[in-house]
Amino acid sequence: MNKLKTIFKKSVAEDDGQAAAEESAIRNPQSTIGAPRFLDPEVLARITSLELLARTVVEGFVSGLHRSPYTGFSTEFAEHRQYMPGDDLRYLDWKLLGRTDRYYIKKYRADTNVQCHILIDASASMRYTTTGVTKMQYAQFLASSLAYLATRQQDAVGLMAFDSEIHTHVPAQNRTGHLRTIFGRIERLVAGNETRLAETLHLAAERVTRRGVIVVISDFYDDPDAIIKALQHLRFKGNDVIVFHVLDKNETDFEFTEPVLLEDSETEEQIHVLPDVLADGYRNAVREHIDRLREGAAQNKIDYELFTTDKPLDFALFSFLARRARQ
């Protein structure tokens, strides 16, 4: 899979008009048709504060749920579980049934709070971009938004970031000021060294001491079988595991038309490539890699979602919220 770990070229987003863009993103969140503009990664890249970014994304996402394809689903479901035959009807939420035509049982507050551990791949390959938003930035946006959303649900949030080792670890807590600590650690992350993804996920599994939800955000450039075994380790302890596979669109589509020099972002090995010769084989290799990850995740009851860095964040937030509601 090393042939997939490539940095073709590094592009940098323009900083001009940054302050105006931040204000526009907040004041005019619905400035485009379709997905809310505040969920667009390129707009988010112009907001310098992760705390402001996360609050803007999550509050906009939650308020927009009733207008979305996910009609009838909202964060209140995190305090419910689906009705099962034999459940005491005294605890059926009749008001929710009337609004949504769905049968849910209320859960006590003590039963609804869980630990959410967010694991971020900060290896060198996460620097790659052709859209102006690197995979690392997208992971930071996503992790910050998930941390804010989990805190909004009264969950304890923890963070781990890794490349060849776990270099950042904030244990899960739910106390005043903790979310700001999480934001600060996420903001300081820099994509750096070579990764040993599977090995590091095994180490992360040993650090999670209480059952909860584990979110893994990575480009998953490692042997798929080794990755699945590591995810099984996370899952084995009774955790619900959500995999967010983040790639640049060009990594999946390989849209180069001219000869190009490819450089492995972690080993710095370079190779000259003729796109006409490589393109089909490359796309097939990527497709096979993704399919093996998706199938392995499904076999182990792990949620798998593939995102390119141009994709709005609402898809990821809904996936997280849906998994959280099953707790």
Residue ranges of predicted features:
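Von Willebrand factor type A / integrin I
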Residues: 1-19, 34-69, 79, 206-212, ...
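Short, electropositive alpha-helical surface patch
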Residues: 170-184, 322, 326
